[in-house]
C-alpha cells in the first residue's frame, strides 16, 4: 500500500482547551466537514462521535483522548481530542508529546480559564505551535477582544487576530477575514452555505485598524518584510501567509480565529488555518534519542530512516483487547512484523494495525513516518515506551508524569470479586500512568491513587461498567511526603557475629535537602575502594528502601541528595545485604538528625463567584488554610485565586454550592508541596 498523503501534506494536531469551551464540538464539526461523519453529534445530547466512553456521554466531558484521522483539501489531518478537566491533565501531556501543532479553543465568554493556562504551559514545555479559536461567539457575554487581551496578559502570548466577528451573541452572523479584507456571511444553520461579500460599512474602519496591527505584527517577525513595510510597500497575502506560518511554527506568534462550532460558523476557516499555519512532520526538528551504547542520536521524519515510534496511550478495547496508540517518527512498519520495545528491551509482534476514527476503526497494513495509528498484539508495551526497528535500537525521550496526589482504599462488594477487581485495576493502571494501585502492607487494603476526586470516581465507575466489578470506596487520603530541612553527616556500621560467617557493612553519608520537586539524587564520592564498587549499588538500594517510609508519620521521603563519601569493608564478612542494611539504617539516622518535616500538596484554586458572595467565599478559603493570591473582575463576576492544601478541599464543591446558591464555580489543579504547620503535622502523625 503506497503512501496516500506525502509527509508535507500531513498534520498531527491536538484540540485543547478548558472544560466546556466547546472542544469536542469543534472536533465534531471538523469531522463533519471533512466528510468523516454524516450526522453531527451534539455533546449535550450525549451523541458525540469523539466522546465514546459511557461516562463521557453521560457527563458531557471528554476523558480519554480519541485519535481520529480526517482528510481536507488533499491533506491528511490526524486529530487528538484532549480532555479539558484538570484531573485528566496526563492525557493532555501525552497527546502534546506526539503532536506537531495544536488548536487552542477558548470560550468567548470565559476566556482564559485555569485549565487553558495549564494546557498552554504544557504546550510551551513541549514547544507545540498553536493557533487559537475563540468559540461560542453566539452566547450571552461573548467578547472576542477581551479574550485576545487575556491571551496576551495571562498567557504571555503574541496573539494576532486573523479575523474579526461580525456581530456577537444572537446577532453573530459572520466573520471578517483580515488577510483578504472581505467578509464571510453564513446563510444556513449547518454553516455549509456561506457568502463572501464586502465588509459591512460600519466595520470598515475597525477592520482597517486591525489589519494594520496584523501586518505590523507579521512584519516584526521577518526582517525583509519589515524593510518593505517601513518603506511603505504593500505586503502581498502570500508574503504574509509565509511569514505567519514561519512565526507560528517557531512559537513566536499565535494566529487567532473566531466562530461558533455549535452553530457551525467559522469551523472550515479553522481547518484551512491548520493546513496554512501549523507544521507538517517535516517542519519540526528531528526527534532525539539514545542509542544502545549511550550515544545521542536523531531520527528525521522520513520513510527512508529506520523505524522508530512512541507509544503514547494504551487502551482496553471491548472487541480487540489491548490497543497501543503510537506515533511513527521515522521509517515504516507493516502489520505482522516484529519491533523492539527499546524501553523494556523486549521483542514484540505487531498483530494488526488500526487507524482509528473516534469509535470506528479501519484496518491498514502499513504505516509511514508521521502517522498516528493503534497496534493490536503488544503485550509488554506501556505509555511512553519506544518501539523501533530491532536492527537499529533507539530510546526516544520518554514522557514524565506527575505523581498521584490523592488516594482511597477500595474493596470489592464480595470476596469472590477480589481477583477480578485486581485484574481490572491492573488494566486501568496500564492505561493511565497517573493512576497507581498498591496493597497497604499493614492493613492488607487495596489503595488506589490518582490526580483528583473526579479521576478516582471515573475509575470506580469504569470498574462497574467495563469490568462488572462493584466496589466500595473509603474516605480520600492525601499523599503526604516527608523531607529533611538541614544537611547532616552520618555514619553507620552494621556488624553481626553469630558463629560462622558474620555480616559487616560500614558507610559514611552526607544527606542534604534539595529544592522542592528535584527528587532523589545519589552520588558516590568514595576513593581508594573504601566501599568496593559492587557494594555501592546496595547502599543506594538500602537508602531508597528506607525512603519509602519516613520517621514523622511513615510517608515517603522526597527531595534529598545523598553522598556516599567513605566507609569500610571486611574481606570475608561483607556482603550486599550488609551494605544494604548499613545504607538503610544510616539514612534513618539522617532523618532523625536532619529535622524531618511533613509536606502536603497545595492546589491552585480559582473560584468564579458573583460579587454578593465574595466575602463568604474568601472567608471560607481562609478557614481552609488557603493563601489568597489575588482577585480580578471577569465578565461580570469576581475571580479569586488561592493556594489551598488538598486536605482541606474535600467536599468543597458541596459547600461552595450551598454558600453561593449554586452560582459559583471552581477549578483546582495541583501546584506544589509545602511544609505542614507543626500543629497540623502532629494531628496527622497521631491519626495515622
Swiss-Prot record:
InterPro entries linked: EF-G-like_DII, EFG_II, EFG_III, EFG_III/V, EFG_IV, EFG_V, EFG_V-like, G_TR_CS
An annotated GO cellular component: cytoplasm
Residues holding GTP: 17-24, 81-85, 135-138
Keywords on record: Cytoplasm, Elongation factor, GTP-binding, Nucleotide-binding, Protein biosynthesis
Gene3D superfamilies, per the entry: 3.30.230.10, 3.30.70.240, Elongation Factor G (Translational Gtpase), domain 3, P-loop containing nucleotide triphosphate hydrolases, Translation factors
GO biological process: ribosome disassembly
Subcellular location: Cytoplasm
Residue ranges annotated for the tr-type G domain, each copy included: 8-282
GO molecular function, one term: GTP binding
Family indicated by similarity: Belongs to the TRAFAC class translation factor GTPase superfamily. Classic translation factor GTPase family. EF-G/EF-2 subfamily.
Function: Catalyzes the GTP-dependent ribosomal translocation step during translation elongation. During this step, the ribosome changes from the pre-translocational (PRE) to the post-translocational (POST) state as the newly formed A-site-bound peptidyl-tRNA and P-site-bound deacylated tRNA move to the P and E sites, respectively. Catalyzes the coordinated movement of the two tRNA molecules, the mRNA and conformational changes in the ribosome.
NCBIfam families: EF-G, PRK12740.1-3, PRK12740.1-5, small_GTP
Protein name from the UniProt record: Elongation factor G
Organism listed in the record: Clostridioides difficile (strain 630)
